[in-house]
From Swiss-Prot:
Entry-linked Pfam families: LexA_DNA_bind, Peptidase_S24
Keyword Transcription regulation included in the entry's annotation: yes
Organism: Shewanella sp. (strain MR-4)
Annotated active site: 123 (for autocatalytic cleavage activity), 160 (for autocatalytic cleavage activity)
Site (Cleavage): 88-89
Protein name from the UniProt record: LexA repressor
Assembly and binders: Homodimer.
Record-level Gene Ontology MF annotations: DNA binding; serine-type endopeptidase activity
Amino acid sequence: MRPLTPRQAEILELIKRNIAETGMPPTRAEIATRLGFKSANAAEEHLKALAKKGCIEIMPGTSRGIRLPVEEEDNSESGLPLIGQVAAGEPILAQEHVEQYYQVDPSMFHPAADFLLRVRGDSMKNIGILEGDLLAVHKVQQARNGQVVVARVDDDVTVKRFEKKGNLVYLHAENEDYSPIKVDLSFQSLTIEGLAVGVIRNGDWL
Protein backbone atom coordinates (compact mmCIF):
# COMPACT_ATOMS: atom_id res chain seq x y z
CA MET A 1 0.00 0.00 0.00
CA ARG A 2 1.33 3.44 -0.91
CA PRO A 3 2.09 5.72 2.05
CA LEU A 4 -0.63 8.13 3.17
CA THR A 5 -0.37 11.85 3.65
CA PRO A 6 -1.09 13.05 7.22
CA ARG A 7 -4.53 14.29 6.14
CA GLN A 8 -5.38 10.98 4.44
CA ALA A 9 -4.32 9.08 7.55
CA GLU A 10 -6.54 11.35 9.64
CA ILE A 11 -9.55 10.69 7.42
CA LEU A 12 -8.94 6.94 7.38
CA GLU A 13 -8.77 6.90 11.18
CA LEU A 14 -12.02 8.90 11.35
CA ILE A 15 -13.74 6.37 9.09
CA LYS A 16 -12.53 3.41 11.16
CA ARG A 17 -13.54 5.08 14.41
CA ASN A 18 -17.00 5.99 13.11
CA ILE A 19 -17.63 2.42 11.94
CA ALA A 20 -16.43 1.02 15.28
CA GLU A 21 -18.61 3.38 17.31
CA THR A 22 -21.80 3.49 15.24
CA GLY A 23 -21.59 0.58 12.81
CA MET A 24 -21.78 3.05 9.91
CA PRO A 25 -19.23 5.04 7.90
CA PRO A 26 -19.46 8.85 8.06
CA THR A 27 -20.98 10.89 5.26
CA ARG A 28 -18.87 13.27 3.21
CA ALA A 29 -20.53 16.19 5.00
CA GLU A 30 -19.71 14.70 8.39
CA ILE A 31 -16.06 14.25 7.41
CA ALA A 32 -15.92 17.84 6.19
CA THR A 33 -17.47 19.17 9.40
CA ARG A 34 -15.29 17.17 11.76
CA LEU A 35 -12.04 17.94 9.95
CA GLY A 36 -12.79 21.55 9.09
CA PHE A 37 -13.09 21.29 5.31
CA LYS A 38 -14.98 24.07 3.54
CA SER A 39 -17.18 21.63 1.64
CA ALA A 40 -18.05 17.97 1.24
CA ASN A 41 -16.33 18.09 -2.16
CA ALA A 42 -12.97 18.50 -0.43
CA ALA A 43 -13.66 15.38 1.60
CA GLU A 44 -14.63 13.55 -1.59
CA GLU A 45 -11.25 14.28 -3.18
CA HIS A 46 -9.43 12.79 -0.20
CA LEU A 47 -11.71 9.74 -0.27
CA LYS A 48 -10.90 9.17 -3.95
CA ALA A 49 -7.20 9.32 -3.10
CA LEU A 50 -7.68 6.78 -0.30
CA ALA A 51 -9.58 4.51 -2.69
CA LYS A 52 -6.76 4.69 -5.24
CA LYS A 53 -4.33 3.61 -2.54
CA GLY A 54 -6.52 0.63 -1.64
CA CYS A 55 -7.41 1.88 1.84
CA ILE A 56 -11.16 2.12 1.28
CA GLU A 57 -13.79 1.15 -1.27
CA ILE A 58 -16.30 3.72 -2.52
CA MET A 59 -19.83 2.60 -3.42
CA PRO A 60 -21.54 5.23 -5.61
CA GLY A 61 -25.09 6.39 -5.12
CA THR A 62 -25.23 6.61 -1.33
CA SER A 63 -24.02 9.21 1.16
CA ARG A 64 -22.46 6.53 3.36
CA GLY A 65 -21.02 4.51 0.50
CA ILE A 66 -17.64 3.91 2.09
CA ARG A 67 -16.38 0.54 3.25
CA LEU A 68 -13.10 -0.85 4.44
CA PRO A 69 -11.51 -3.67 2.42
CA VAL A 70 -12.17 -7.10 3.87
CA GLU A 71 -8.75 -7.33 5.44
CA GLU A 72 -9.35 -4.02 7.23
CA GLU A 73 -12.70 -5.02 8.69
CA ASP A 74 -13.07 -6.33 12.19
CA ASN A 75 -14.37 -9.80 11.47
CA SER A 76 -14.32 -10.96 15.06
CA GLU A 77 -17.64 -12.04 16.47
CA SER A 78 -17.91 -9.11 18.84
CA GLY A 79 -20.51 -6.42 19.16
CA LEU A 80 -24.19 -6.93 18.43
CA PRO A 81 -25.20 -9.42 15.72
CA LEU A 82 -27.44 -8.06 12.97
CA ILE A 83 -30.07 -10.66 12.15
CA GLY A 84 -31.15 -10.97 8.54
CA GLN A 85 -33.63 -13.38 7.00
CA VAL A 86 -34.75 -15.99 9.55
CA ALA A 87 -35.25 -19.55 8.33
CA ALA A 88 -38.31 -21.48 9.43
CA GLY A 89 -37.75 -23.60 12.51
CA GLU A 90 -34.29 -22.19 13.26
CA PRO A 91 -33.33 -20.17 16.38
CA ILE A 92 -33.27 -16.47 15.59
CA LEU A 93 -29.66 -16.19 16.78
CA ALA A 94 -28.45 -19.13 14.70
CA GLN A 95 -25.11 -18.24 13.10
CA GLU A 96 -26.48 -18.55 9.58
CA HIS A 97 -28.93 -15.70 10.31
CA VAL A 98 -26.20 -13.24 11.31
CA GLU A 99 -25.40 -10.78 8.49
CA GLN A 100 -22.64 -8.98 10.37
CA TYR A 101 -21.63 -7.63 13.76
CA TYR A 102 -22.03 -3.98 14.72
CA GLN A 103 -19.60 -2.45 17.18
CA VAL A 104 -22.35 -1.09 19.41
CA ASP A 105 -22.23 -1.13 23.22
CA PRO A 106 -25.24 -3.25 24.33
CA SER A 107 -25.48 -1.23 27.56
CA MET A 108 -26.45 1.86 25.55
CA PHE A 109 -29.93 0.38 25.71
CA HIS A 110 -32.02 -0.51 28.76
CA PRO A 111 -32.31 -3.36 29.28
CA ALA A 112 -29.15 -4.23 27.37
CA ALA A 113 -29.61 -5.30 23.75
CA ASP A 114 -28.73 -8.83 22.66
CA PHE A 115 -29.10 -8.42 18.89
CA LEU A 116 -30.18 -6.07 16.11
CA LEU A 117 -32.98 -6.73 13.64
CA ARG A 118 -33.38 -4.82 10.39
CA VAL A 119 -36.89 -3.40 10.18
CA ARG A 120 -38.90 -4.31 7.10
CA GLY A 121 -42.10 -2.44 6.26
CA ASP A 122 -43.87 0.51 7.88
CA SER A 123 -46.31 -1.20 10.24
CA MET A 124 -44.73 0.47 13.31
CA LYS A 125 -44.07 3.92 11.85
CA ASN A 126 -46.36 5.77 14.28
CA ILE A 127 -43.95 5.09 17.14
CA GLY A 128 -40.87 5.94 15.10
CA ILE A 129 -39.81 2.47 13.95
CA LEU A 130 -39.21 2.88 10.23
CA GLU A 131 -38.24 0.63 7.34
CA GLY A 132 -34.48 0.14 7.23
CA ASP A 133 -33.96 0.98 10.91
CA LEU A 134 -31.94 -1.36 13.07
CA LEU A 135 -34.10 -2.41 16.00
CA ALA A 136 -32.20 -3.18 19.20
CA VAL A 137 -33.73 -6.23 20.88
CA HIS A 138 -33.39 -7.61 24.41
CA LYS A 139 -33.94 -11.38 24.30
CA VAL A 140 -36.82 -12.61 26.48
CA GLN A 141 -39.35 -15.41 26.26
CA GLN A 142 -42.33 -13.64 27.83
CA ALA A 143 -43.90 -10.22 27.40
CA ARG A 144 -46.38 -7.99 29.18
CA ASN A 145 -49.34 -6.29 27.54
CA GLY A 146 -48.34 -3.08 25.82
CA GLN A 147 -44.72 -4.01 25.19
CA VAL A 148 -43.28 -3.89 21.66
CA VAL A 149 -42.00 -7.35 20.86
CA VAL A 150 -40.24 -9.35 18.20
CA ALA A 151 -42.54 -12.33 17.80
CA ARG A 152 -42.50 -15.44 15.66
CA VAL A 153 -45.92 -16.59 14.50
CA ASP A 154 -45.89 -19.91 12.67
CA ASP A 155 -42.27 -19.14 11.68
CA ASP A 156 -42.96 -15.59 10.44
CA VAL A 157 -41.01 -12.98 12.43
CA THR A 158 -42.76 -9.67 13.10
CA VAL A 159 -42.40 -6.55 15.26
CA LYS A 160 -45.67 -5.56 16.96
CA ARG A 161 -47.23 -4.36 20.22
CA PHE A 162 -48.22 -7.30 22.42
CA GLU A 163 -51.64 -7.90 23.98
CA LYS A 164 -52.80 -11.17 25.56
CA LYS A 165 -56.41 -11.97 26.47
CA GLY A 166 -56.79 -15.46 27.83
CA ASN A 167 -55.80 -17.90 25.10
CA LEU A 168 -55.70 -15.19 22.44
CA VAL A 169 -52.79 -12.92 21.59
CA TYR A 170 -53.18 -9.78 19.51
CA LEU A 171 -50.13 -8.30 17.82
CA HIS A 172 -50.96 -4.68 17.08
CA ALA A 173 -49.37 -2.54 14.40
CA GLU A 174 -48.69 1.16 15.00
CA ASN A 175 -50.08 2.11 11.62
CA GLU A 176 -53.80 2.41 10.92
CA ASP A 177 -53.34 0.68 7.55
CA TYR A 178 -52.64 -2.65 9.27
CA SER A 179 -55.05 -4.87 11.18
CA PRO A 180 -53.96 -6.71 14.33
CA ILE A 181 -52.56 -10.20 13.96
CA LYS A 182 -54.73 -12.56 16.01
CA VAL A 183 -53.07 -15.69 17.39
CA ASP A 184 -55.09 -18.47 19.01
CA LEU A 185 -52.64 -20.29 21.25
CA SER A 186 -54.84 -23.38 21.31
CA PHE A 187 -53.67 -24.30 17.81
CA GLN A 188 -51.16 -21.67 16.64
CA SER A 189 -47.50 -21.33 17.52
CA LEU A 190 -46.23 -18.06 19.02
CA THR A 191 -42.68 -17.44 20.25
CA ILE A 192 -41.53 -14.20 21.84
CA GLU A 193 -37.99 -13.59 20.60
CA GLY A 194 -37.38 -10.35 22.47
CA LEU A 195 -38.40 -6.82 23.45
CA ALA A 196 -37.67 -3.72 21.39
CA VAL A 197 -35.35 -1.53 23.46
CA GLY A 198 -34.14 1.05 20.94
CA VAL A 199 -33.60 2.05 17.34
CA ILE A 200 -30.46 2.88 15.37
CA ARG A 201 -31.03 5.04 12.30
CA ASN A 202 -28.16 6.22 10.09
CA GLY A 203 -25.72 5.35 12.82
CA ASP A 204 -27.53 7.34 15.53
CA TRP A 205 -29.22 6.02 18.66
CA LEU A 206 -32.86 7.18 18.90
